[in-house]
Amino acid sequence: MTDTSSFSRAVHRPWRGTLRAAAAAALAGAVALAPAAAWAAPVDPDPDATDAPVLSGEVTYAMAPAGNGIVDEGDSLTVSFVVNNGTLEAAEGVDVSLGLSDDALASRTSLSSWLAGDSSAQTDEIGATSFGATLSGAEQTARLTIDADDDALADREPGVYPLAATFTRGDDSVEVRSAVTVPDDGEVTPLTVVVPITAPAIDTPVLTAAQLEELTAEGGSLSSQLDAVAGTPVVLAIDPAILASIRLLGTSAPESALAWLTELDALPNARFALQYGDADVAAQMEAGFETLLEPGALTALMRDEDFTAPVEQQTVEPSEADTPTPTESSSDDTDTDPETLGIPSLEELLSVDASHERVYWPATGTGGSLVADALAEANGDDDASALILTESALVTGTGATVPARASATDTQLLVYDTDISRELNAASVESDTTLRAAPLAAASAYLHFAAEDAGEDPLLVTVDRASTERSRLALRAAVLAATQAPSTAASPFAGLVAHDPAPVQLVAGVPDDDRAYAAADMHADEDALARFATVLDDPELLTGPNRDEILQVLGNAWRGDESWPAAVSAQRQGTIETIDSVGLLPPSTVQLLGSSSTLPVWVRNDLPYPVNLTLYSQPEDLRLDVEDAVTVVASPASNTRIEVPVQARIGNGEVDVTLDLRSPAGVQIGSTERAEVYVRAEWEGIGITVLAFLVGGLLVIGLVRTIRHRRRAATDGDGEGEALEADEDDAEDAASATPQDDR
């Protein structure tokens, strides 16, 4: 027996006390045998300590066997113990006693009861160690090794044995539980492991280039996921939105993202596609959708220049016969011309080269009969090929192992083991190597019983989706714990699908009303957007990205995220703003002084695309005649002027003109506006009459003067003798006639 203890080390970063305490309790099976207050009295952190680590207010204890808890013949047993002080004061030293039962647990049900602290077992001490005082915010680790030739390990039959560590301080003690598995070298059970390839939660249609560069860089989330599954026989459940995000960038995609995509394509693993954005299929079915939402077109997010490649063309030097003058150009000279590769189709963007086309994986706990039956019905005539991935906890029964290939009436199922998958997922998100060993040991124990129950029938487990980022090492440890487990052998996905289904019955499940209502609301908004989008030559420029954004917001990565309601509200507000991006500007008052003119109307278009509109005008008074409909193409991101012909009929006064914009499909765009037109058409008639009277009067006066002048000229030939007299008479006549002419 070897006892190795580590000295206390101070924690200089915020310690995840609450999370780690929960992990130690849930994964290692911590059970308090003494009053909790004596061990973990909550302590309020010092409000004045700004640089101090965040403390849990508790002292926590954990225990985990190494090697996934598997002890084969000739193996030693190494167990780690952890004490973490999350209080403001130093914790006193504790003694640790390790006990192992001589009697194997009878079933997986008894294993669950043991780990949960609901049952007891007789354990004999096989080793002991101790801890000194643990400083505030510090953690201590000790390891105890039981040699292979120790009587406690010798000649054990295959099975799962209770393992317990008792932490004692004075008269108080806490017991932490785990299990040791002695494998059976007999028959092996076919095992299929499913691992999701998903991205963190986003509220945009696709991942940006910057996000992709970060996720696919060394140590990034997507890079870690791929590294963790490389070289293993797992089945990949891939979010096609990740692949589309890379492919739509074309030649402008980050190099790391292109390399990641190439590496994914090179993996020989079987795979199937999740819904776009790993959207919540249960929420859609519970919202009453007849079918699942399909991803929308991504054309609006692509650029032509990202899908051209330079093509080298050899420049052939002319021969001497054709060119008498030698040239200095070399035959190695080349020209580069762009070659258009073409915008990829949506199918090409989303392709994952799936081994099976219709596999639906509801989030854990949501794949009950209500959702599964709705999914099968949504596939209509194709329901025979649709497979719903659900968990054994939703199958009615006594907690025994459930066949991986099953059917509930006409619904075809792939059933993964809840207990094993839960422990594997817990291990995959635990960054601490020592604490990670606890759920891995529990997974091995459950897997032993599952293989024993299943015999030659296939088993299915998952390393489920994670709400937090997990490291490559943690995820790979969980994957290897399943794929390399004793008594199992990797089963191809095609073999699992082709296996005869066993009849089972699913429980209904509990609907998540909040997510169902959110799905219904966003879908209703989408219908309004689809009507508005008829202003475009290609409505999918708007509806496509919006649909993909909805699916991303419905993504399972948002589960448990407190900011998800805000993401839903932001998505709905964005749709409202898009619908409001085209409309009439409030018209100004117009003075109409003539019988005909134009009514200026301005159309606001905030979209980056030209929009097709028809302006309908309707006067509310017969004094004004307005052109009923004027068609216009409004320029993108600008205000466009429309001139509506108007004509006054009779009378003067104020006339309201109702203005409506409609799309070519007849959908009203924006709100109705009213233009005030002041008609002054009679002033024009009065002005013309006065002007005509003045012109006519001037013409008459001119004509009279001309006639009189000619008469006088005719009398000039009667004699020069009378000229003087005539001149005098004319002068007198003129003097007397002038006042009369003026009148």
Q: What do these predicted regions represent?
A:
Residues 537-685:
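Membrane-proximal extracellular "stem/stalk" segments
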Residues 178-273:
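Active-site beta->alpha N-cap acidic-glycine motif
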Residues 82, 220, 224-234, 335-357, ...:
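Catalytic grooves of carbohydrate-active enzymes
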